[in-house]
Amino acid sequence: MSGHNKWSTIKHKKGAADAKRGKVFTKIIKEITVAAKLGGGDPNGNPRLRSAVDKAKAENMPKDNIERAIKKGTGELEGVNYEEIVYEGYGPGGVAVLVECMTDNRNRTVGDVRSTFTKCNGNMGETGCVSWMFDKKGLIVVSKDADFEKLFEVALEAGAEDVADEEEQYEVLTDPSSFMEVREALEKAGFAHESAEITMIPQTMVKLDGKNAENMLKLMDRLEDNDDVQNVYANFDISMEEMEKLM
């Protein structure tokens, strides 16, 4: 499990996700709007929109909010025009960090992101400085209650690249182009997923502890707390014990 996934899991267990539900809703609504704008308003024909709608349902977002966000994206309702930008930089200990943003004010966002890096002993870099250290993949997370051998067989037959047996869950990795096909095959075979998304997987990990670990978690928390930031990917590895102590 990547450092970011561990961090998200612990945050969810401790209820931090619930405390920030308003921010979570804001980010999902932006993603639904942009996905509908780029690929149309039908989730069945738009994988990005389907993933965003699934996230909204998992967070118990009211159906009206979802439909309104889709209509803003397709132009049926008036909405804000968001620009997608990715910022890159380094966290404490040389950790590679990718920050995906959706903003209606590029100047505000770049200033906020740069300031956050600096305050947490990191620094923002040039475009391309760390993106080569990540691979774009489909990631489908399945509960440990599932039969691993059957999951492995169904996933690979549908075109998955790998199925990993992690500490808390099974993780099915796919190429982005086969993500929807694998996901649908798993659903048909009765495997309910805990999450399914296109994400950035780090090629190598940087082990952190002590002050560097503490500052890295602060950086993640502050970046994700920014309304303009949609996703943060980083290649840090902090032990579960240390992470639980620091959070």
Curated annotation (Swiss-Prot):
Major subcellular site: cytoplasm
InterPro entries in the cross-refs: Integrase-like_N (IPR017856), TACO1_YebC-like_2nd/3rd_dom (IPR048300), TACO1_YebC_N (IPR049083), Transcrip_reg_TACO1-like (IPR002876), Transcrip_reg_TACO1-like_dom3 (IPR026564), YebC-like (IPR029072)
Disulphide bonds in the chain: none
CC per GO annotation: cytosol
One matching Pfam family: Transcrip_reg
GO molecular function: DNA binding
Entry keyword set: Cytoplasm, DNA-binding, Transcription, Transcription regulation
NCBIfam families from the UniProt entry: PRK00110.1, PRK12378.1, YebC/PmpR family DNA-binding transcriptional regulator
Family, as annotated: Belongs to the TACO1 family.
Record's protein name: Probable transcriptional regulatory protein Gmet_0743
